Design a protein with these regions (language model features):
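Bacterial N-terminal signal peptides that target proteins for export
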Residues: 1-13
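Bacterial N-terminal signal peptides
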Residues: 11-21
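Sec-dependent signal peptide cleavage junction
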Residues: 19-32
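N- or domain-start disorder-to-order transition segments that initiate the globular core
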Residues: 36-80
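M16/MPP (pitrilysin/insulinase) zinc-metallopeptidase core fold and M16-derived inactive scaffolds
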Residues: 78-157
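M16/insulysin-pitrilysin zinc metalloprotease superfamily fold
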Residues: 111, 147-184
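Short, glycine/charge-rich beta-strand/loop segments that flank catalytic centers
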Residues: 124-126, 138-143, 173-186
């Protein structure tokens, strides 16, 4: 694995861990009440608060944090909506039309160290209390969004996505990648 990719993955992992550790304290605050802990310039777990703002369309308060060592960025949004969401995204620019980032998107969700079941993603989609769960690959990025009305469930989904992204079973079982990547042309 290249140093650049490893550094990017580490940045995202640190970013998401920090976001999850802040969530309970931030969610306890009212959307209208300013948080003294989130003042611009404050440093929280190695992340500097670089901007506070509002997103009028969603009647939301926003905070942008940047990790001092890695440059990873966290965008935190809080409003009165009871539907909670989590997303982890990676820059995955295409170098050709072979669809390799899309194959990795599928392979990533075919089990992880903590969640070794290859069918767990589909079980989570159809048999749990989520309001949205998916993964998508675009020309420049791959994203793994999930939403739920239950904060406890959302944290479990986030844990599943994080472990799938950073500890995928494809390292242990190369056939998972091959089963997603095979192609037959006439």
């Amino acid at each position: 694995m290249s140093k650049r990719l490893l550094r990017s993955l580490l940045s995202l992992m640190v970013c998401m861990a920090m976001l999850l550790s802040l969530a309970p304290a931030l969610l306890a605050e009212s959307a209208d009440a300013p948080s003294t802990e989130m003042a611009v310039g404050a440093v929280i777990h190695g992340f500097e608060v670089v901007e506070n703002g509002e997103f009028a369309l969603l009647n939301a308060k926003t905070t942008v944090l940047r990790h001092q060592k890695t440059g990873a960025t966290v965008f935190f949004l809080i409003n009165e909506d009871t539907n909670r969401a989590f997303d982890i995204s990676f820059v995955t620019p295409l170098s050709d039309d072979k669809g390799i980032p899309h194959v990795f998107e599928h392979s990533t969700l075919d089990g992880s160290k903590k969640y070794p079941s290859a069918s767990l993603f589909f079980n989570l989609i159809y048999q749990t209390y989520n309001t949205y769960m998916n993964a998508a690959t675009y020309q420049v990025m791959t994203t793994y969004p999930v939403a739920s009305l239950s904060e406890a469930q959302l944290l479990k989904y986030a844990d599943f996505y994080l472990d799938s992204c950073f500890n995928p079973m494809i390292y242990e079982d190369e056939s998972l990648f091959r089963s997603e990547a095979w192609r037959y042309s006439l």
